[in-house]
């Protein structure tokens, strides 16, 4: 008897990402105009970025530094000698009708980064994704379409050249990615790295991080790649994942029905949750690259390389390894804590001040993160210092206060700061841990509720929670919960 192999197991996706990352320099790559986001259209421009006759571009050295640091963080080989090239194409947002980029001698090549896919059980699957190259280039302007939310229905277009000449690094991955979730995690890890380095804010909504995805599908076991399709217009990590999943499905169905896949560029439409054809894909020969005549070759000295390498911070992957191996945290916890550099810094400072690592992690990931989201602030804005959080964790652990009391006073600590221990003493919230004192309160509660006591002893054992609640009410939550539970059980059975 023959069986049909499910379509999804017959094919595999081959995926690569081209990620454009705006660098956080104060001025543009080849001129002194500001890179400020959100300025009035066409105010941050100058003769150089507009390509006026007779102007000469000069490389912003900070761009070179940031590009090299990004290359080092991605385990790339840094080119001590590289150059810029002109990429020729015609589009309204490109004032010079060419883009200054790097073609055959990029600043960095042959790197890799490791991604982690956290499973439902909290463990992580790790995979290395190769980096083909990293190169420097200038950004283009921005077209603003009017008359419709969609390009196809717009009745007019305007161009803002403020973005023209803003420095970019383009990071090209090897085709090592096999799913939408791997691609989304790769893009997120890139953002973590550039943010840790301080070379970019990685804000996708403002266009500081833009990903183009190349997807092809081939039968499992086939060595040759299928026809590649490029996808653009994804402004979130979830959109990257969904666009890839849709495109894999589309190409698989096309192959199954005998349809030919066309090499083209497609746009992801968020509203319809599908990709639509934009244009046929150009090859590098269509851009007529040639060396940029107005900018001399770039040379990186060994002294510069050593200096920039020494300035690299501890990166997300290094922190995750240390948190798991040294602090015993789960893959999920380490992922959450290292997603933001400042959160990781705060966590480490609290642990260094003596806080139990797991308890500190729980407070940072739970109540503190909820407070930050509610107040729309960052962890740098709270007045609860890391050593105060360590103190809070310690006085819970040593029985000075209960976890409930800690939750009650946390909002005040987050908004006003100060010593948790002093606040607890001032408010008279120190936990009651004296056995005789708690027994006396339990006796009062039982005497005041004879009906409930009779019902409990008649088989309604769930009423134990009622008695615990009454004790907590009388003590304003100060009775030691563990001791209270034990003593009530003993009294009820007596």
Curated annotation (Swiss-Prot):
GO terms of biological process kind: glutaminyl-tRNAGln biosynthesis via transamidation; translation
SMART domains: GatB_Yqey
Superkingdom of this protein's organism: Bacteria
PROSITE patterns membership: GATB
MF annotations from Gene Ontology: asparaginyl-tRNA synthase (glutamine-hydrolyzing) activity; ATP binding; glutaminyl-tRNA synthase (glutamine-hydrolyzing) activity
One Pfam family, short name: GatB_N
E.C. number: 6.3.5.-
Record-linked InterPro entries: Asn/Gln-tRNA_amidoTrfase_suB/E, Asn/Gln-tRNA_Trfase_suB/E_cat, Asn/Gln_amidotransferase, Asn/Gln_tRNA_amidoTrase-B-like, GatB, GatB_C_1, GatB_Yqey_C_2, Gln-tRNA_amidoTrfase_suB_CS
Keywords: ATP-binding, Ligase, Nucleotide-binding, Protein biosynthesis
Catalysis performed (reactions): L-glutamyl-tRNA(Gln) + L-glutamine + ATP + H2O = L-glutaminyl-tRNA(Gln) + L-glutamate + ADP + phosphate + H(+); L-aspartyl-tRNA(Asn) + L-glutamine + ATP + H2O = L-asparaginyl-tRNA(Asn) + L-glutamate + ADP + phosphate + 2 H(+)
Assigned protein family: Belongs to the GatB/GatE family. GatB subfamily.
Record's subunit section: Heterotrimer of A, B and C subunits.
Main function: Allows the formation of correctly charged Asn-tRNA(Asn) or Gln-tRNA(Gln) through the transamidation of misacylated Asp-tRNA(Asn) or Glu-tRNA(Gln) in organisms which lack either or both of asparaginyl-tRNA or glutaminyl-tRNA synthetases. The reaction takes place in the presence of glutamine and ATP through an activated phospho-Asp-tRNA(Asn) or phospho-Glu-tRNA(Gln).
NCBIfam families cross-referenced by the UniProt entry: gatB, PRK05477.1-2, PRK05477.1-4
Entry protein name: Aspartyl/glutamyl-tRNA(Asn/Gln) amidotransferase subunit B
Organism, scientific name: Trichodesmium erythraeum (strain IMS101)
